Amino acid sequence: MIFNSKAQNLIFLKNKAKSINVLPLLCFAFSEYKKNKAAFINRIINTFQSEVIVRSSAHNEDQTAQSNAGVYNSVLNVKPTPRSLAKAIKAVGKDYKHADDEILIQPMLKDIRVSGVIFTRDHSTGAPYYVINYATDGKTDTITSGSAQGKKLIISRTCKLNEATEEFPAERLLRATKSIERIFDSDALDIEFAFDSQKKLYIFQVRPLVIQSANSGAKISDAQFFAHLDALYKEISENAGKKTGLYGKRSIYSMMTDWNPAEMIGSRPNLLALSLYKNLITDNIWAVQRKYYGYKNVAPHPLLYAFSGCPYIDVRTDFNSFLPAGLSPKTASDILQCYLDDLERQPELHDKAEFRILFTCAALTTRETVQKRFAHILSQEQIDEFIGCLRTITNNVFAPVLPLYQKDIAAVKKLEALSKNFFAKEMCFEEKIRGLLDLCREYGTLPFAGIARTAFIGRQFLDSFSEKKIISKKNYRDFVRSIVIPSQKIQSDIVKLKDGKMTRKRFLNKWGHLRPNSYDILSLRYDEDFEAYFDEKSPYKPVPKKAEKYSFGKKQLRQIDELLAQEGLCFSAKHLVKCIKESIVWREESKFIFTKILSRILSLIKEYAHTLGVSEKEMAHVSIDDIMKQFKTTKAKKNFLIAKIQKGQADYAYTKCIKLPEVLTSAADIYCFAQNESVPNFVTQRKIKANIVAEDKIHNTNCCNKVVCIRAADPGYDFIFTKNISGLITQFGGANSHMAIRCLEQNIPAVIGVGEKRFNELRQAELVEIDALNKQVRIIR
């Protein structure tokens, strides 16, 4: 069908489908109106006795090639008086260019329960989903105007209606939508709708959906896509049952729990990045570290699964790995099931599980919190057993003589020297990569995991100091800001660079290995694109924040000592504070050390690919295991890699098109899910108002005094702190993520981990206000 103007499309629908409610309408050419305004206004007044909406219906709107949505005005709640109507019609028609551009008048619909827009395909990829954006605030234009945060429901076109959400009458909307698709002979539509309080459905607009890039350039038929979804459903279902050696009746999968892969490698990583993350951390290393620190041994179960290329943490396995090793099976099973039930009830906490769901140590408030949480689930004997096991772990982590994490620090200190010796050896490419990965695991990611665990426990102790009123929130903030970590030195060095006190060569020798996405071969290192990251000629210089001078007073230390003794902990307050500081410093230091080796591995792969005539973009679709396979001839290796590249590219086409929730509680979620509202983490207590700079514009925009939006919180993004930003917003990230810590140190207000939906709304805004104290972020315009 050839689509017409907004008004004509509604008239066509009204005439073809008597069962679909279209509000009464009156339309006329703006050019004709200007010839006899009084006659047309009288006609409107005679037709409508209540408030109306004056809408555009222009020649170049709602067409197949472009919708021009929002180009022309609509005026709501117009009183049926000559003056009000004339003013509204003028406002709508003032930008018209064609003689046949129309004015559309309809009565204002009152008593609205739900309003929104349904796309009959994903507008970015053309994938076969119904995507419903809706609001329940009683307004007709909340979604179309973007004036407030709405909700989103994603439904596969094969999903049975009874699988849809109960949020609003989804069955009725989908039935009407399918009828409209038949009438317009199109399955790519953009339909504006509303339900009144009686659940009566009204259609406000039907236009062709302008798809940005159908299937992202891949030729995937709907039948192929549905078969892919069904295969994925089977895969998830088979993984969800009971597993030997693990407590818990079922699995839940999350993109952001614990080792937060969505933050570190993205929600749709390339295969090389995904496989490197698994190799270095989630296949085995994470479990070895947990066992070493006194938690349950969950080997050989992997932590991370890739569903259609999207990384998910197996939450059941993860939560098992936080159970103390000494727990009796009955107690462990009861606690684990409680954890899973908590997350299923509150999936928005999936990136805060260690702070809001799990108990992983014995801090000063743990005993009373555990007692309250499990009072009706565990017996008192089980509660005492659990607290005792947590106490044992905590005493080992902060042991007065050689605490566990200090062995990890000693190990990571060896990595750089070992890697230098390794590079001096003569060996083939594959052996070099394999050897570097072995070194990086043993002396990099394994000790890093232990140090990071210690820092997490330290954070829980700091929280408990605050809860016990031993320190104020300001004391807490000043203490963290008093700790000097490696990334703070970048700011000092960029100032030296701009002042001519440091050469570029020296600067890049220290920091050149960093990439905004540490595991991604396509992410350029600082030394590969220096000008994009650091503009030496810019007059703006970072203002290094002075470290706060804060130390615990004698009274505070005495209070902590008394409480530590009451909890049966065998270390002193002074020792604990020292351990907390040291673990925070070395968590960041060890991250910088092992990512230097990781960056070198990626550079070697890139160099090797070029010798084979393969680009890094192609190599990104090959797993690290396949890259390390050896062949007798270079030609055989190249042919093998080309075959893997082709398969990887084909698989990635599905990865780009598929839509999955951040938390999977059931295999059925892949067919229908509501996009969960994330609970963001607010940093500092400051309030600012500033313009937005989206991630893709950072390199060619002056970011000074602006709020920067980035998806992840990777250390490679530290360069943004050299640009004197006013605030930071990230899609992914938890309360203890790298960027949360950096912003706290810099006293920069930040909103960490807002989730996909809110992030997309915020990055498209012009001006936002962050009120960290009241935990609010608002779009001003």
Question: Which functions belong to the PLM regions below?
Answer:
Residues S464-K468, S487, K549-I658:
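Extended, domain-scale alpha-helical bundle/helix-rich regions
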